[in-house]
Amino acid sequence: MKRNILIVIFSLFFFLSFARGSEEKNEYTEKDYYEALKDNTFYINFEDKKYLDRIFEKEDLNNYNIILIGENHAVSVNYILKFEFLKYLHENYNFNHLLEEIPISQAFLINLYLDSGNENILNQIKKHTYKTYFCTQEHFDFYRKLYKYNQNQQQEKRISIVGADVEHQPILAYAAMYSIIREKEDLNSLSDIKILLEKLVLKGEMDKDIYSIAQKCDKLIFDEEMGESLLGKKDFQLLKLINDNILNCKTLYGSPQNEFNKKRDKMMYDNFRILDNDKNKYFGIWGNFHVWQFQVNGLLPFASYIKANKSYSDKILSIMVQYINCMYANPQRDYEPEKIENKMFYLQASYQDKLEKNKGNLYIYKLNYKNSIFNKMNINGKKAKPGETFITDLYQYLITVKDSPACKKIDFTKHSK
């Protein structure tokens, strides 16, 4: 995907600049990095809460309403990080929403699954997301695990999903719209929408242009007052939002390649603002570029829009992940495992071995502590000049993952009904 190529290039550029050490003036040395990290490197142990408490003991996570981790997709360990951090934040800091890099309609359908446990919903999503990074065994097993977790929570304490992406799979979006409207009676002028959606969802009948249904629906839902009286305000606004999001997808995929990332992240932020409730607290794992809190090379990531919002300017925390000797599942090659390595702060062995001592394959660096060199370092690993972006302007922690396998190819026979 376009964004993954961008991030890999950036990571390699950063590491090559960093790895030269003190060959150039104004560079930090390997010893500088080691001294900066030796007291700020923590083992991640999800089996004992005190390890996580120690990582964040000087942070006070109560101050944050949004915490985002930046991943490379389809690495198995991502789903361990996702579930365990979500559970920790939910149980200790009342984070009640999982903010996902998925379309609004998919979040709606997954919330239906979390309410019912109906595997047919997941099967429907699997069918239409095959050949994407989000159609792996771990991805759907995560939702099953979340469903079981929620069953042990009081109704009002259960975690729900918020999706902010555009509708990359319009057929799934139409299925969600039909789920909203199918039980409604006396729809008057909106009955034409129900007929259009029934033809597609139940009979498989569709025009050559997959977006034509959304265009027809758009003409039928212009009267919001009438729509809200027929469907109720919440359902009508969701129906309209999903339909608008389908049309946004058409606009996005019709854009020049160099405009794709710019437009997509702005569209995702606009969706988030519509869906946001200031009482919510969000945790999510997104593609790594999206969690940066400041523009890079003229590109504004999703999190940078949130950071610029006065309501969230000091309430968002970003955590990056670097992968050492890991594998990911490549959906373009039928989910074959391929190597991924994006070293960002990884020192020569004489120093790195000391940092990793007794820390296993999963540990985290705190970068934003008082008087940290990372608060003075530009994105190329050099001492920042006036006006340059600091590393900690982008993200404040860095997780190191070692030796993770790739996600598994989905088994379409498992859980099918």
Which residues make up each language-model segment?
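Sec-dependent signal peptide recognition
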Residues: 2-9
